[in-house]
Amino acid sequence: MKKYLYFPGCSLKGSGKAYEESFLAVCKALGMDIRELEDWNCCGATAYMSVEETKSYALAGRNLAIAEREDLDVIAPCSACYLVLNKTQKALKENTEIRRKVVNALKAGGLDYKGTVKVRHPLDVLINDVGLEKISKLIKNPVKGLKLAPYYGCQIVRPYATFDDQHDPVTMDKLMKAAGAECVTWPLKTRCCGGSLTGTVPEVGLRLAYIILKEAKKRGAGAIVTLCPLCQFNLDGYQGKIASKYESVDMPVLYFTQVLGLAMGLPGSELGIKRGIISAEAVLAGGGLR
Amino acid sequence: MTENKSKKETLPRVGFYICHCGSNIASMIDVLEVQKYAAALPGVAVSREYKYMCSDPGQEMIAKDIKEHKLERLVVAACSPNLHEETFRKAAAKGGLNPFFFQMVNIREHAAWVHEDKKSATEKAKDLARAAIARVRFHKSLDKKRVAVDPNVLVVGGGIAGIHAALTLANAGKKVTLVEREATIGGHMAAFDKTFPTLDCAACILTPKMSAVKSHPNITLWTYSEVSKVEGYVGNYKVTVTRKPRFVKEDLCVGCMECIDACVFKEPKFKDKFNQGLGKRKPVYIDFPQATPKVVLVDPETCIQLKTGKCKQPCAAACDRKAFDFNQKAETKELQVGAIVLSTGFKTYDVARSPQYGYGRYPGVYTALEVERLVNASGPTSGEVVLRDGTHPKAVGIIHCVGSRDAKTNKWCSRVCCMYSLKLAHLIKEHSGAEVYNFYIDMRAPGKAYEEFYDKLLGEGVHFIRGRVDEVTDWAMTPEEEGKLVLRVEDTLAGFVRRIPVDMVVLSTGLEPQPDAQEVRRRFNIGCGSEGFFQERHPKLAPVNTFTDGIYIAGACQAPRDIPDTVAQAGAAAAEALSLIDAGFVELEPNTSHIVEEECSGCKTCVPLCPYSAITFDEAKKKATINEVLCKGCGVCAAACPSGSIRQNLFEDDEIFSEIEGVLAK
Amino acid sequence: MPDKPKVAFYWCASCGGCEEAVVDLAEDILKVVAAVDIVLWPVAMDFKKEDVEARPDKSIVAGFINGAIRTSEQEEWVRLLRKKCQVIVSFGACANSGGIPALANQFQKESILKYVYDDCPSIDNPGKIRPQTECVDEGRTLTLPELRNVVRSLDQVIDVDYYLPGCPPTPKIIMNAVLALLSGKLPPKGTVLSPEIALCEECKRKDSKPADLALTEFKRPHQVLIDPEKCLLAQGLVCMGPATRGGCEALCPGGNMPCTGCFGPTTRVKDQGAKFVSSVFSNIAPKEEAEIDAVLDGIPDPIGTFYRYGLSKSMLRRKLN
Amino acid sequence: MSEQFEPKIVAFFCNWCTYTAADLAGVSRLKYAPNARVIRVMCSGRVDPQFVLDAFAKGADGVLLGGCHPGDCHYAEGNYKTLRRMRMLTRMLKDMGIYDGRFRLEWISGAEGDKVKSVINDMTKKVRALGPLDLPGKFKNWDKEIEELEAQVNKGDKDKEAVHAG
């Protein structure tokens, strides 16, 4: 079986801990050979790019350079990391000036980068490398009756729609259906969750998050399932504020890896189910789980 | 050894003429300098410049000089030989010189128009002139071969273009075979309800022409058939046609359709292609009531008998003319024709390539062709505008330029969408009373009475919003939007983003080349433009001709085109074919190859090289020979003959070697 | 009795095979000897340069010169003979087009000398001494001819009247040439004294050649057991016959060896190698570049194969650098 | 103004695709380098390797051969014959010291006027970088080594004539 390197980024070590726990648990259950990238550093996130382009590329580039020594694909579950690393990869490939500067910087740190690393998203790997067939086989405990609103966020399909449709992504839907869940069809799969605006311009950020939550509820979803730590944080963490500003939605926001894990019969405790601010207990119980 | 001996011999007298082409050439090339330069070259007896060499006085001048100055060779530096070679050959002939003692120099397309530095362009012109003058010395006196033209014509594609071309030719007394891939002729037009801008019913004006084709004594109609092979040359094409099995004997079926009622499937069950899948049909079916020929056919994919061989065959039983034949096989037929008209039509843009418009995701989203059937009295809903969910739309949004004028999909304007969108807007409003919104980039209504039609719709209260729709979504932001499809668009006239809630969205898809356009053009040995439509010989002066003589193109296979233009073009193509046929013969370029028998060692190298089997090996003489009528003059054999025993007229080794030396010698 | 017409034989850069060819006339040579006075024939008789110089210009009816020209001495000799002879016959492939010696045109003079005097395994030359064109020994100046950088055909140095092709020319065409000279029935200047039709015409294997070769690989004679009847090209062997002037009566194919092109091309062809390539490769089977290259790999030394006897007269004459 | 080397390029274009494309480039008023001299043939298959060698021998710095795309030949398969011959010719040119870039085979369809422009511009640029080939000049230089002796011999003749005259 193919080997992979895992790039956690800051979120999966912090606010997105549940994502890391469930992701690694699922990988383990699938028998994937995956190892955390040694001595990785901050990807720079989307903000840094607009401030210090070259430096931000060098920062992200360092991770690519370390990965290249191993000559393995890198899995970046965090959407921001996924986007930034891919953007860097692209910039280093296409812009000779930037490559020159960045590689010089890396050389100073005893590193080099040829540009061979592939940065991939868990969805991509699960669907295209592992395959639905294998996954379905491992579904011991299908989450029957669980109605989910699959929410992809903006970063994994924009600007690079490498493994899914830019307007109507479906890979997560497929996985959730394989897990036994029902998926609502809705048009907001890739609409903005508010991003950093929830912190900087709350009146705008909260509204955007509210739109997603409300629509999901309207479509009869018991929970939103996502793949982005920031989306999860915005949609889950601000529901209190949203309740006071608009209305109470009370919509649990899970990671797709959590649902997958449950369906594969892994204990909720290993999947960080309890870490959610809006408790998923009820819906999951409805889904006949645990 | 004997190299360049000919140079020492006395040179033939060359006349050199350079054309200003108004300022086309003169503005970038110092015509006088080239004329003076040529005058000083060995063998040049006369050197002149003139404003328009191709004009009558220009040609007269040449003819006169040939006589007065006893010119033995002619060189004209002007435009591309593809344009005026023939003109100046005639001028030479007028002066009593064999037309092939002539060489043309292309200093317009290949120099004046493509360079920016007058000095270097002029130098280039000199080099090319010098080369032609060096080469023309070796030219020989040649005659064009005349071959008879077969008066029969093949028309490929039975849309309105093919129908019109076939009828025009047949009315002129020519025997025409019309080959159509589908089970009926009529093409896209047969699927339309009304036609813009006159709103006369498509069926009413088309079906008479369709039946005229069927009943015309001079037309053989082969539907459900495809051309599989084309051999031969202008005036003498041999065409192989494959006729797919209908499993119903065409000559016996009268189209009573009782077999359809009798079919074991009591209800129509399968997507019906003609109705864009909006309607259903049985395994035994006929596309539409006026289908021509009015002959049913059986679909092997869905017919139980053909799939399993286990069916009571009530259809066959119901046919008192015993027309059914489940063992029918595809048959191949051969035709001899002199000319071919290609009118293979177009394909509409695949909306799956524009997922933001939600086709397939939202049942309320339709393609324009689907709506054509929806508003059509003989369509699946008998003309009633009913949505897939059975409801009637109160508001309809029509999105223009889907798959047109778009860097992401197709760059070109599809030319008909604005007008048919207006037509559909009118029809939908008329049939359903719904509010109709048109979302357009620019309104293009350049045809006769088109702009007036646009005015008329403005008067009818159809809404027009200028802007490219960003997305179609069912996400409601306001109560009014609940349960609706919302079109998000920047209104570029009002200058803000609007959300328009509707019940039905119509995607005005653009026109594309047929998916198999490339194979087809290879089969007929013609070209395609970069966007994939068939390439005309000249965009302005030979719009229905191709680079292969005797093969003409008409309609949307050449470029997006509406019905009036298509019919006009079909007429033009038919006229071109007629002028070829009625001449009775074609003159073939004499640029054929021949083998000098006493030089041939009989090594057979050339024999397999000829794609037209023009070269054969004479077992008695043990030498190869070339049939100059079959030879199309590519010269591959001449280049390959290892003992230099094959000559290609107009491209002999001496001619090319001297041209090489000519362009390089300073 | 009037003295017999005088003829001269001379050899330049050649293997001696052409001399052999003259001897191969067998008893016919007696006729020749009887008919003419040989005034120069280094391989067989002892004449000195002074003897020739002493003769009045144009006093020799014909000079037969074989071998390519690659030293200053050869140039002196052929120029001298040009003066003394009425007719110069370029004798054999080397004189006509450089022959085997002209393959040296693929290398620079220096690299050749370096190999021969320094690097060649069988050389013992610790002082790395190279021959000098001039050296003084005990007050006497000794000279050696200069080795030229370009190997030339005879007609690239002096004006030539007739050409006898072949490596070597066959007794038959030699005899015809001699008789023509003696009888004075001479063809136009510059004529190659051999048929203008390619070799296939006279090859016994001709009928066994299929029209469509569609070759998928080329083999070399040592790699296959050669069918003695079948066309050699059809067996995947490079046979230059189709691009080579006839006249030898297909000796090599007769001896179960492919034609290597020693008679040179017909007059209608300027570059034998290029023309042969044009003919044979038009018709190999593959259409994809990679597959085509695979077939071409069967010919490791194209220049040596297609210009074995004619590099001096090829359009490019020698390797550039 | 600095005199930069302007390469001479001989271009053999097939009538149906590449020559037509060059016409199209003209009609579209595309601008490209004036270094190429087009020789029209009906099919790239007419181009005998001898033509390419002769062009170089007569002073071309580069030779361009343009035909229809594989599968699109107006004469069905002429361009495949071209491809096969020219693959071998390219090897021979290399062995004779004429390296890649000086000889180029391009497939340009009748619709690709812009490709005529880009190919000729690109080739002009690359051949300019390679510098002059100038075989005619090289031939002259090569023959310098035999001129001295030739001169002597001729001089020898002159002297004699002088003597006779005296």
Locate predicted features:
Chain D
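Iron-sulfur-associated redox domains of electron-transfer enzymes in respiratory
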Residues: M1-G166
